[in-house]
Amino acid sequence: MTKADTIFKENITKIMEEGVWSEQARPKYKDGTTANSKYITGSFAEYDLSKGEFPITTLRPIAIKSAIKEVFWIYQDQTNSLDVLEDKYNVHYWNDWEVEGVPANNGDKRSIGQRYGAVVKKHDIINRLLAQLEANPWNRRNVISLWDYEAFEETAGLQPCAFQTMFDVRRVGEDVYLDATLTQRSNDMLVAHHINAMQYVALQMMIAKHFGWKVGKFFYFINNLHIYDNQFEQAEELLKRQPSDCQPRLVLNVPDETNFFDIKPEDFELVDYDPVKPQLKFDLAI
């Protein structure tokens, strides 16, 4: 059993047994009913990527390719355009969060509001981060924050779930490692937990490659970790499943010091990944 599988089962059990019920919940199911959930607060996990510990479960298949494409949409394209996400990456699941009548920051008609990539572009976040790390890798101010109150007031839209990432550099012997800490306000445990984690591992790997560093540790903090009330059957099924006997890891197949903006989604490869099937179905809360 991988570390991710152990943490996954522990969190499911804790939510089901100790979690409390949501109140005044915002999300809705597609039929218009309120999407209530059981949740815990203050979830934390640590993975040492340099030792092959990756935050992806083997208990069900995870759509890692689409997840990584979303990272490129946010941090390379730096846009909120649903047209870019669909036409360039063939990713469609963000359509449920389209904000009608709000154009994208690149002029396209369809957007998710002033969120995610639009905020990255507005503050030139990636270029500033890379410049800081270039000037002084050991500085302690390497922060990506997507929490922009001005943007929230400017347009409607889903406020970012994974909203803050911090980076630190460590030298161990002759090797330099890049660590990352992801902070998330809210996480749908069964659907999005490993998707979000692996997205930001991919971002960590892209930044490390840009400088020719090794990937180090990945820290993951979630303020509200929940399971929706229409997912309890799937939760029980996941607890019953025996994990696959594999050790999945994400590989970025580009040379060291490849420019961040020259890396492509197809440069990533998930190896030794043989998840348990069949896939489970989930009705998303919007």
From Swiss-Prot:
Q: Which residues bind (6R)-5,10-methylene-5,6,7,8-tetrahydrofolate?
A: 188, 285
Q: Which reaction does it catalyse?
A: dUMP + (6R)-5,10-methylene-5,6,7,8-tetrahydrofolate = 7,8-dihydrofolate + dTMP
What Pfam families does the annotation carry? Thymidylat_synt
Name of the protein: Thymidylate synthase
Task: List UniProt keywords, sorted A-Z.
Answer: Cytoplasm, Methyltransferase, Nucleotide biosynthesis, Transferase
Name the GO cellular-component terms.
cytosol
Chain positions recorded as dUMP binding sites: 140-141, 185-188, 196, 226-228
Function noted in UniProt: Catalyzes the reductive methylation of 2'-deoxyuridine-5'-monophosphate (dUMP) to 2'-deoxythymidine-5'-monophosphate (dTMP) while utilizing 5,10-methylenetetrahydrofolate (mTHF) as the methyl donor and reductant in the reaction, yielding dihydrofolate (DHF) as a by-product. This enzymatic reaction provides an intracellular de novo source of dTMP, an essential precursor for DNA biosynthesis.
Show the active-site residues: 161
Give any single GO term for biological process.
Answer: methylation
Q: What class of enzyme is it?
A: transferase
* Quaternary state and interactors: Homodimer.
Molecular function GO labels: thymidylate synthase activity
Is Transcription among the key words of this record? no
The record's subcellular location field reads: Cytoplasm
The answer on whether this UniProt entry bears the keyword Cytoplasm reads yes
- Enumerate the PROSITE patterns for this protein: THYMIDYLATE_SYNTHASE
Q: In which pathway does it act?
A: Pyrimidine metabolism; dTTP biosynthesis
Q: Which family does it belong to?
A: Belongs to the thymidylate synthase family. Bacterial-type ThyA subfamily.
Note the superkingdom of the native organism: Bacteria
Q: EC no.?
A: 2.1.1.45
Against InterPro entries, the record matches this protein to: Thymidate_synth/dCMP_Mease (IPR045097), Thymidate_synth/dCMP_Mease_dom (IPR023451), Thymidate_synth/dCMP_Mease_sf (IPR036926), Thymidylate_synthase (IPR000398), Thymidylate_synthase_AS (IPR020940)
